[in-house]
């Protein structure tokens, strides 16, 4: 069991964090490169923002202790705001849009709710599926 001041005890913590940061890089590149290079998912743009930022918040929320969920949400909001500002100043065919930022916030809020309702242990659950406890029953 993890100590209260630490995140969940994860065997694959480095892998989970590395995959999370790969997702951050992917979302950053997808949001900042010219639109002609980005695949069209044929979803509503605001839904894409909510899914991307909510997914990131849920991902990283599963890697930290419960008391850090609000920090994860705040960092994700800063990330979303930074992306919108960068889109506005880069002039590569992207526009700064407050509605995209609000959609990011909706996704993050949904993820935060899911984390508090119990999905925050998702990484531990996956690891238990991969490596079941060898303790005698």
What are these regions (language model features)?
Residues 1-101, 105, 109-137:
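Bulky hydrophobic segments
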